[in-house]
Curated annotation (Swiss-Prot):
PANTHER family: LEUCINE-RICH REPEAT-CONTAINING PROTEIN, PTHR48051. PROSITE patterns: LRR. Residues 154-167 have a biased composition (Basic and acidic residues). Leucine-rich repeat protein that likely mediates protein interactions, possibly in the context of signal transduction. This is Plant intracellular Ras-group-related LRR protein 4. Residues 119-167 are annotated as: Disordered. LRR repeats lie at residues 245-268, 269-291, 293-313, 314-337, 339-360, 362-383, 384-406, 407-430, 432-454, 455-476, 478-500. The gene is PIRL4. Belongs to the SHOC2 family. A motif (GVYW) lies at residues 501-508. The keyword Kinase does not apply.
């Protein structure tokens, strides 16, 4: 508003009314109902979070080696930072509520002005001017789509505006009191983030905008929300109102900076897909076990060091990604996930896979690369549905004999371990198509004699071991199309044959065995005169004994 017009002389009612409306139009757009609710809920959230942080700070105890004054300085700094952070988090919410308060106040002013115009004037005349229409507010955008995907944005088109208070709604034509022909300036809905109206480089969602989005999504019964890499770096936690999204089936919050999830996440009762990869989550709330319809859960690339016991309740879960965390163990409850088809726990600190893994009776793919495994449980043989097993870069010395029961196994990768041998029982897993036992270095000196049973094998990697001789049954691997044997002291077949490719090796082994068999048939051992004499004496004795009988 132009401050120079504040002392402008107004000689008529029309001028006063126009000035009132000019001042009113100068206000920023009024926040929507959902925004106001979100702001109030956000402030409550922050207050609870602050209280929890302050209580945690108060519980900290000083070590005997730390000076009391120094420890007190640290405590006060932590408290000061919590207060500073909370002010930053609610700054937008407070500003929004202040704006709503001003609009409410101006509503009263407009109503009073309308009453003055409608009532007899001070000079005894009655104004012929109609009452002033009330201020309007923004309304939630009515959208036929049931998903909000911030990766695919479309322009927001203004819809009909509605009043915050229905008693103020006027359906008459705009009054001619306004020079522009409108009762109030058109306002674009504020509930959605600017990324919905701009290009791919739109600014990211702040806490208040996220809270507003949740409110409007809850009322619209939104089914899908994609906020991948769409939250500001300062946004480390999610508002409790997240639990209102009971109709949500898919939620993508990946590639943000989330540290903690609210307990109310259990309220997402319809959720089937939850993607939280590439955040900084250190612990999961027990309420995650209430997501009973969850089918897909991606928690990769976080900072998890444990899993809640409630995990066992996710019996519909089919895909679970726990890769790139700090997990030292997998809980026994993992065996309760009877619908699980794909489990990825690579790049953790896991030393042992629990025996209960045998309860994952639907498991098709298990990846546990880059851990500290020393062995695989015998129960692995119970998972007859398993097709892919990858345990690269571990400390495994031997494979369980029960692997012969893996009737569906197609791919096995145990490279970069400490394997001393491959059990003969593995050769009963005749469905194997890919086998990688390379890079076990000095520990691996031979292949199982019955490796030829793996007639479906197409890829075999035995590189960087100490294997000198291939077994005779190798000739049966007629489907082999990839064979890596470099950095082995191979004697049979010779290195030049191995370099010609897998079929050359198979043919060489076949020719070698046939030649050896042919020689063994041609060479018949001759009896010595001692053997002949002994044989004839023996026969004579047998014959005479038969005659006596």
């Amino acid at each position: 508003m132009d401050l120079m017009q504040m002392d402008k002389r107004l000689d008529s009612t029309e001028q006063v009314v126009e000035e009132i409306m000019r001042i009113h139009r100068s206000l920023p757009a009024r926040p929507g109902i959902d925004e106001v609710e979100a702001a109030k809920g956000l402030i409550d959230n922050v207050e609870k979070e602050d209280q929890a942080c302050l209580e945690a700070i108060a519980r900290q105890r000083k070590s005997s080696e730390v000076p009391g004054e120094l420890f007190m300085v640290l405590q006060e700094m932590k408290k000061g930072y919590v207060q500073f952070r909370s002010k930053e988090q609610i700054r937008e919410a407070l500003k929004l509520l202040d704006l709503e308060s001003v609009h409410s106040l101006f509503d009263d002013f407009i109503q009073r002005a309308s009453n003055c115009i409608a009532s007899p004037s001070s000079n005894g005349s009655v104004s012929s001017r109609p009452p002033l229409p009330p201020a309007t507010t923004t309304a939630a955008r009515s959208d036929s789509q049931s998903s909000l995907n911030f990766s695919e944005r479309a322009p927001v088109r203004p819809k009909d505006m509605v009043s915050r208070d229905d008693s103020f709604v006027t359906k008459s034509k705009p009054s001619s009191l306004y020079s522009d022909g409108f009762a109030a300036p058109p306002r674009r809905p504020q509930i959605l983030d600017s990324t919905l109206t701009t290009g791919n480089d739109g600014e990211k969602l702040s806490l208040i905008k996220l809270a507003s989005l949740i409110e409007v999504s809850a009322k619209k019964a939104t089914q899908e929300i994609n906020l991948q890499n769409k939250l500001t770096e300062q946004l480390e936690w999610l508002p409790d109102s997240l639990g209102k999204l009971s109709s949500l089936t898919s939620l993508d919050l990946s590639e943000n900076h989330i540290v903690v999830l609210p307990n109310t996440i259990g309220g997402l009762s319809s959720l089937t897909k939850l993607d939280l990869h590439s955040n900084r989550i250190g612990q999961l709330p027990e309420s995650i076990g209430e997501l009973l319809n969850l089918v897909y859960l991606n928690l990769g690339s976080n900072q998890l060091s444990s899993l809640p016991s409630a995990f066992s309740r996710l019996v519909r879960l089919e895909e679970l990604d726990l890769s790139c965390n700090n997990l030292p163990i997998l809980p026994e409850s993992i065996g309760s996930l009877v619908s699980l088809k794909k489990l990825d726990v690579e790049t953790n600190d896991i030393e042992e896979i629990p025996y209960s893994i045998g309860g994952c009776s639907s498991l098709i793919e298990l990846r546990a690369d880059y851990n500290k495994l020393k062995a695989l449980p015998e129960a692995i043989g119970k998972i007859t549905t398993l097709e892919i097993l990858s345990v690269r870069y571990n400390n495994i010395r031997q494979l369980p004999t029960t692997m012969s029961s893996l009737a569906s196994l197609k791919e096995l990768d145990v490279s970069f371990n400490e394997l001393e041998s491959v059990p003969e029982s593995l050769c009963f897993a005749t469905t194997l198509v890919k086998l990688n036992i390379g890079n076990n270095f000095a520990d691996m000196v031979s292949l199982p004699r019955s490796i030829g049973n793996l007639e479906m094998l197409e890829e075999l990697d035995i590189s960087n071991n100490q294997i000198r001789v291939l077994p005779d049954s190798f000739k049966m691997l007629t489907k082999l199309r990839v064979f890596r044997a470099q950095e082995n002291p191979l004697h049979i077949p010779p290195r030049d044959i191995a370099e010609k490719g897998p079929q050359a090796v198979v043919q060489y082994m076949n020719d070698l065995v046939e030649t050896r068999n042919a020689k063994s048939l041609m060479v018949k051992p001759k009896k010595s005169w001692v053997q002949m004499c002994f044989f004839s004496k023996s026969n004579k004795r047998k014959q005479s004994s038969m005659e006596i009988v």
